[in-house]
Amino acid sequence: MITRTVVSGLTVEFSASFFNVPSIAEVQRALYDATKLVSGRPGEEVKQRLRTGTVVTTDDRNWELRYSASALRFNLSRAVAIDMESATIAAQGYRFRVPYGTLLCVSDKPLHGEIKLPGQANRFYEGAISEHLQIGIRAIDLLRAEGDRLHSRKLRTFNEPPFR
């Protein structure tokens, strides 16, 4: 299915192979708090480095090869990231309103024209994987401590129909 939208005189096509996954405020807050606790960095520094928001998920493994065709669509989505594997899980969680969370360890900026060199990625991952896992676990602990107070209008109850 393809839908067409006119934005500022431009016609933009949206295919079923792309799905915008919005962020959940409670998870964003838990990730921010966990990042401050684990990294020991002050709040202003965390705000400069931590990115939370809408993630675009796609089943098109070659989207980067047709960047100009996808760029307008991605820019209009206001997405902070484009992901395939973890965002696919998040898309289904959003679709069926099942709570989900995704913590991405990003080593490159594919849309910024940087070359992806193996040595650079390896150095990044050596230092970042442990910290990212600690942040994820701490965020889950913070969310668990909230218990019944957690609420998001983006979530459905189990007996509510998934599509309306």
Language model features: what each stretch is:
Residues 1-164:
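Glycine-rich phosphate- or other oxyanion-binding loops that anchor nucleotides, phosphorylated ligands
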